[in-house]
């Protein structure tokens, strides 16, 4: 069975942009987002580089209690989804 998919809105939380506009601008500039790992001590690890998402504040997208209960990857998903809903101009109350 084939289904058609329609993209109505976009959202992004990435190492090179915390929204679609910044992400796209940085792609055009050739920014890669890779740098030294800062989230934990890498002394005992061979890997020293990563593409970390920096400057993300979950409280901009959800209440502090919800943010505390979620892993960071889930916070990213919620934030990107909210941006996509706004971009699509969807009225979620309907």
Please report, for each region that a protein language model flagged, where it lies by residue.
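Conserved "HGTGT" condensation-loop signature of ketosynthase/thiolase-family condensing enzymes
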Residues: 1-94
């Amino acid at each position: 069975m084939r289904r058609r998919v329609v993209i109505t809105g976009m959202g992004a939380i990435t190492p090179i942009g915390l929204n679609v506009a910044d992400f796209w601008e940085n792609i055009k500039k050739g920014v890669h987002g890779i740098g030294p790992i800062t989230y934990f001590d890498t002394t005992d690890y061979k890997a020293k580089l990563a593409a970390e998402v920096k400057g993300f504040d979950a409280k901009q997208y959800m209440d502090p209690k919800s943010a505390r209960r979620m892993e960071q990857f889930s916070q990213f998903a919620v934030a990107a989804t909210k941006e996509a809903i706004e971009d699509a101009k969807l009225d979620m109350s309907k």
